[in-house]
């Protein structure tokens, strides 16, 4: 069996790869693992708004209960809310049913330990072993009072909203904010948080129907938010993705701020307050050259990890650091939460705007972004490209043309059948041509996937 877990849990097309049967076996596996430490471990389960969410939720919960675990079902709730609530409410583990920014036919299942952290690779390997044993009917099947219970608690999202609001000391009274919920997990709690802080909130894409999550909206399709911010003469636009573990922002001029810019602003705020541990902010290999240059000029150090918020978090925990994240909008404030948190991130920036009494476009001026081109090549196979001499030669040629003023980065996606080609440097047209040349070669050598 191929490895089930990718960089963000188990993810795939529902009823093709991610079936109710697999969700059931994952539940049995997780309850078996956490049951080693405690009889009847209690899990918190949350989900996003996909049509398949309730089906997978039922199967996962049934699997947990069948080996003696207990379940509390929170319903639709952001991923970072589950991470926070597991820790704050004393659950033994958590599970989130979501495929984040992916389209609605996909879904996923990821687990958190009792401290609100995603599971390390070695634990996921153990879960995979238990999944195989469950499929072979080798795991225990208790009877009588050995079977677990299921409870429903739809109020837990309000605890999370209260937590996020109290991470800042500033009222947002007088601010006009356009909020794009991506028709996802924060469609209700996002507006609750912002209005609770005193902002005037204009909501878009907060009416999920099971099929419209991330559909031309949210952080992966931010154009509508840019238009809405200017139409409403708003101070700020906030876009979450489907599970609200990331956010991108739009300033009053309709310009987008990505994760690099957001975490740099927040890191500088913490530095000025004497709260930025080791004066260091953690990015990834995808972080813009301008991010590193600006941080250095502002007296901060930067570190780059592999792409994936789990790798950013791993480094932050290892070195006891405050802020890190990804260009895509995953920003982690480890003093507040244990995973990327879109709403928590957004309110930090809104508070900064109020405290400085400056528009976001001015605050964002601390960083000059280098032009960056990214092409996603949907391939038949995303393995083996590193050893392909033709692909390697194309990359070396492009790097030679950019010299010391730029860079080329090619990597396989951890969650989709994609190879990503990124180039960065001073000239947009040159970058586009270099990226396209490499992308075309990868498509020929790796085989283009069928649409």
Where are these regions (language model features)?
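An N-terminal, well-structured beta->alpha segment
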Residues: 1-62, 66-68, 93, 149-177, ...
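Gly/Ser/Thr-enriched, mixed-charge loops and adjacent short helices
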Residues: 13, 107-232
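N-terminal small/polar loop signature for handling phosphorylated ligands or for N-terminal nucleophile
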Residues: 32, 39-106, 192-250
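Short glycine-rich phosphate-binding loop at a beta-alpha junction
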Residues: 39-48, 72, 176-178, 279-285, ...
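Short beta-strand-to-turn element immediately C-terminal to the catalytic PLP-Schiff-base lysine
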Residues: 111-114, 248-252, 332-334, 424
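Proline/glycine-rich low-complexity loops and linkers
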Residues: 125-161, 166, 252-324, 332-333
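Phosphate-binding and adjacent anionic-ligand microenvironments
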Residues: 236, 273-451
């Amino acid at each position: 069996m191929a490895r089930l877990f990718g960089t963000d849990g188990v993810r795939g097309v529902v009823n093709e790869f991610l079936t109710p049967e697999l969700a059931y076996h994952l539940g049995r596996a997780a309850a078996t693992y956490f049951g080693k430490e405690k009889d009847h471990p209690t899990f918190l389960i949350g989900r996003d708004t996909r049509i398949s969410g309730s089906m997978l939720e039922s199967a996962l919960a049934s699997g947990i209960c069948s080996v003696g675990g207990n379940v509390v079902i929170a319903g639709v709730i952001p991923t970072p809310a589950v991470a926070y609530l597991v820790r704050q409410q004393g659950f033994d583990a958590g599970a989130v049913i979501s495929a984040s920014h992916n389209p609605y036919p996909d879904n996923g299942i990821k687990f958190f330990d009792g401290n609100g952290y995603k599971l390390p690779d070695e634990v996921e390997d153990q879960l995979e072993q238990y999944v195989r044993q469950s499929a072979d009917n080798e795991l225990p099947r208790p009877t009588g009072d050995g079977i677990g219970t299921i409870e429903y608690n739809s109020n837990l999202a309000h605890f999370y909203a209260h937590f996020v609001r109290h991470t800042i000391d500033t009222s947002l009274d007088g601010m006009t904010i356009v909020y794009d919920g991506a028709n996802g997990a924060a469609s209700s709690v996002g507006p609750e948080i912002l209005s609770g802080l005193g902002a005037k909130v204009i909501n878009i894409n907060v009416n999920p129907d099971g099929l419209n999550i991330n559909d031309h909206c949210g952080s992966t399709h931010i154009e509508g938010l840019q238009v809405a911010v200017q139409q409403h003469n708003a101070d700020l636009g906030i876009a979450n993705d489907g599970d609200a573990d990331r956010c991108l922002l739009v300033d009053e001029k309709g310009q987008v701020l990505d994760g690099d810019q957001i975490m740099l602003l927040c890191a500088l705020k913490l530095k000025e307050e004497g709260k930025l541990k080791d004066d260091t902010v953690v990015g990834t290999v995808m972080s813009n050259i301008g991010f590193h240059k600006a941080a250095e000029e502002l007296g901060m150090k930067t570190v780059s990890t592999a792409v994936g918020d789990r790798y950013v978090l791993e480094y932050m925990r290892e070195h006891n650091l405050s802020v890190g994240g990804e260009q895509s909008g995953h920003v982690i404030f480890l003093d507040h939460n244990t995973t990327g948190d879109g709403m928590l991130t957004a309110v930090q920036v809104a508070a900064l705007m109020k405290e400085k009494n400056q528009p976001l476009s001015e605050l964002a001026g601390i960083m000059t972004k280098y032009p960056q081109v990214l092409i996603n090549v949907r391939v038949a196979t995303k393995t083996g490209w590193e050893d392909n001499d033709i692909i390697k030669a194309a990359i070396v040629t492009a790097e030679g043309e950019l010299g010391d003023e730029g860079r080329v980065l090619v990597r396989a996606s951890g969650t989709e059948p994609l190879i990503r080609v990124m180039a960065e440097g001073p000239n947009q047209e040159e970058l586009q041509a270099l990226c396209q040349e490499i992308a075309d070669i990868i498509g020929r050598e790796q085989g283009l996937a069928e649409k």
